[in-house]
A protein has these predicted regions:
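Hydrophobic/aromatic beta-strand patches that form the interior of the parallel beta-sheet core
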Residues: 1, 40, 75-79, 131-133
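Conserved substrate/cofactor phosphate-moiety recognition/catalytic segment
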Residues: 1-38, 50-53
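Well-ordered, non-membrane alpha-helical segments in soluble/globular domains
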Residues: 20-28, 55-65, 108-117, 144
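A basic- and aromatic-enriched beta-loop-alpha substructure that forms the phosphate/nucleotide-
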Residues: 27-72
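Conserved nucleotide-binding/hydrolysis micro-motifs of P-loop NTPases
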Residues: 45-47, 81-88, 138-139
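Short aromatic-enriched loop/helix-cap "lid" or pocket-rim segments at secondary-structure transitions
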Residues: 52-53, 88-93, 145
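A glycine- and Lys/Arg-enriched "phosphate-lid" helix/loop adjacent to the NTP-binding pocket
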Residues: 59, 67-118
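NTP-dependent small-molecule kinase module
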Residues: 97, 116-154
Length: 154
């Protein structure tokens, strides 16, 4: 499915800090330089917005970023999950087993639920086409099919 795609995990610990908007702008410059390639960004400007709001009580205006992204025909796929603390605890255990260093930044399930609520609120303000998918149950072929249809790949 991802043949020919380039993937960037953009959340490298700088969103929600004084460097967050610089990171967003640099990735945006990179996207504009690579505009003829298929690129997946894991967490981008919406994450900067959520982190600034939750952790610094600041509103981040991402309208200019989205204007530039719109010119690139960018789309957003927001993965959501059931707001079930037991499910979140299980996912955290799995992640920490795979990546033990994640334990240093892992949060309580209630914090992930709070973040998700912010994501779901702010996505409605996006100028970009977006799709919200529930990733509570994985693997999930219907979820994959929905994403491919949204992207025009199926």
């Amino acid at each position: 499915i991802l043949d020919g795609c380039h993937w960037f995990n953009c959340d490298v610990g700088l969103y929600g800090t004084e460097h967050g908007q610089t990171v967003v702008n640099k990735y945006l410059e990179l996207l504009e330089s690579l505009k003829n390639l298929n690129i997946i960004l894991e967490k981008f400007h919406i994450t900067e917005y959520v982190y600034q709001k939750l952790y610094n009580n600041q509103e981040y205006d991402f309208s200019e970023v989205e204007t530039r992204l719109k010119k690139l025909d960018a789309k957003i796929i927001l993965t959501s999950f059931q707001e079930d603390e037991d499910l979140i605890k299980k996912r955290l255990e799995d992640r920490i087993n795979l990546y033990p260093h994640y334990a240093k930044i892992a949060q309580e399930p209630a914090e992930y639920i709070k973040q998700q609520q912010e994501y779901l609120d702010i996505i409605k303000q996006s100028k970009l086409d977006y799709l919200i998918v529930d990733s509570s149950q994985l693997p999930n072929q219907k979820l994959v099919d929905d994403i491919l249809i949204f992207l025009g790949e199926k």
